Amino acid sequence: MRVLGIETSCDETGIAVYDDETGLLANQLYSQVKLHADYGGVVPELASRDHVRKTVPLIQAALKEANLSAKDIDGVAYTAGPGLVGALLVGATVGRALAFAWGVPAVPVHHMEGHLLAPMLEENAPEFPFVALLVSGGHTQLISVTGIGEYLLLGESVDDAAGEAFDKTAKLLGLDYPGGPMLSRMAQLGTAGRFTFPRPMTDRPGLDFSFSGLKTFAANTIRANGTDDQTRADIARAFEDAVVDTLAIKSKRALEQTGFKRLVIAGGVSANRTLRSKLAEMMQKRGGEVFYARPEFCTDNGAMIAYAGLIRLKSGVNSELSVSVRPRWPLAELPKV
């Protein structure tokens, strides 16, 4: 079975073709970073308009890359949520229209299920059960995963997501949008221990997160110590260490609570090298394993949507002809496969 995947939930247009026998056949991606850079963040209307311009040409490019035509596609998967409603509607409308025209089934895919299953695209894929740490610009969640659609929310951020905190703190440090990856690069030049940031909510039981206070702590630290290059790097280092430590502490608790030996990290922030290193070290000490996707599959992409859609379609799930999206969509509401 070959599935075309369409991802348009935010500011990346991702198109891919996945085959259940041979794997990923094509992967096309267009990022809108330059489009939104002047505004310091994603402008929903601009994002939607750009998806309109890019989605069909990228589908054509993906089919060409895979040396396929429309008749070779057995199903279409599109991101139906969560995300920006206008952006989601572009992918959903194109996906449903193509499926109808080609006479194949279409399936709406949950964006975060796509991220959660992205490590399955790798040769060393995780087996169930595992704890998933989903860390992105919009989500920070710990989830018990015992099968496809068998998701139990263990904890989540009560305010800012980890990726959002990275971007906001980067802005305080004078870095351009998107600042998260730039902050991480700056942190590599920082001196460990010059500044010590708190590890929010780690001094109390539970698996929820809170990152908004770190942004405030960073702002106060910047005000008190100036903005010379080394000080900025030292603050970036202290901030990143605090976020990474917090994620590691909570992940360890989730593993202890569930008794699982496998940890999956997914979402844009899972590409962070410091986080990967910290969690790998933690899992080695515990005699467990950590799994993650290659960097290009950590951020939004069509490959994860094509793969998740393939699994859903093979289980017999497909949507009605109507086009609907869900900007807010709890992962736990997904049906078991």
Swiss-Prot record:
Its cofactor is Fe(2+). One of its GO terms (molecular function) is N(6)-L-threonylcarbamoyladenine synthase activity. Binds 1 Fe(2+) ion per subunit. GO terms for biological process: tRNA threonylcarbamoyladenosine modification. Keywords: Acyltransferase, Cytoplasm, Iron, Metal-binding, Transferase, tRNA processing. It comes from the Bacteria. It catalyses: L-threonylcarbamoyladenylate + adenosine(37) in tRNA = N(6)-L-threonylcarbamoyladenosine(37) in tRNA + AMP + H(+). It is an enzyme of class 2 (transferase). SUPFAM superfamilies: Actin-like ATPase domain. It holds the Pfam family TsaD. PANTHER family: TRNA N6-ADENOSINE THREONYLCARBAMOYLTRANSFERASE, TRNA N6-ADENOSINE THREONYLCARBAMOYLTRANSFERASE, MITOCHONDRIAL. Required for the formation of a threonylcarbamoyl group on adenosine at position 37 (t(6)A37) in tRNAs that read codons beginning with adenine. Is involved in the transfer of the threonylcarbamoyl moiety of threonylcarbamoyl-AMP (TC-AMP) to the N6 group of A37, together with TsaE and TsaB. TsaD likely plays a direct catalytic role in this reaction. This is tRNA N6-adenosine threonylcarbamoyltransferase. The lineage of its organism: Bacteria, Pseudomonadati, Pseudomonadota, Gammaproteobacteria, Enterobacterales.
